[in-house]
């Protein structure tokens, strides 16, 4: 199977597999390192490509919307998807790193590797909204530099988001299009459920992140209290008042307190579920069948 050259946004949407893996080479015609490593990417595609593992290329100058949504800031950048969700990124023309990354994902695609994938906790009838998030505009106040918000959106089980000077976090999540948000899934850090969020306040359609002072003075769209985590390393699904989250272009999550009144709050993984509004999708969704 050859490398697919993405020609339009709709072509991009149709290329991302709902079930399986995707490796994307984000390049520019003027980029020397891009040209140097391009033959290797093609060789890897010839070796590993299958119906479960697709290889594609995106010209960042011609497909700016796609590049922006992927968070590409330098070339070349290689982006990897699992079941319609972005799971990893590799920046720079590093042949050995690219070989290792592709080989690892291939082992997951064929089910032969020790890290064979498991899907995230499903919300039946709805889809993960991770592909609809405008990643470059994500923001979190009071996060630790080494444990920032991006740590809660990747697939690395050892990474996590942690607050800094106290237990509170202010998370701003903008979307590439208007969505309906049905539920939030929060996974605690293994063995540290006491540091997981207990009370959260949600605010929709804010143009920017809120300050902690503003959040106290604004009326939340919904307040969720006394969150209970049955397993310390598994997602807890928190259904929202769906009628209040029908047209959402951004979501602010104010982590107000944690379960054990710990000094800092920790989140292993954060995921949103819902569906897009209208027929024009700007992000790839993975539907979870009932």
From Swiss-Prot:
Residues 24-104 form the Thioredoxin domain. It comes from the Eukaryota. GO terms for biological process: negative regulation of transcription by RNA polymerase II; proteasome-mediated ubiquitin-dependent protein catabolic process. This is Thioredoxin-like protein 1. It is found in: Cytoplasm; Nucleus. CDD domains: TRX_family (cd02947). Disulfide bonds join 31-34. GO terms for molecular function: protein-disulfide reductase activity. Has a role in cellular detoxification of alkyl hydroperoxide. Residues 118-290 form the PITH domain. The keyword Kinase does not apply. One of its GO terms (cellular component) is cytoplasm. InterPro entries: Galactose-bd-like_sf, PITH_dom, PITH_dom_sf, Thioredoxin-like_sf, Thioredoxin_domain.
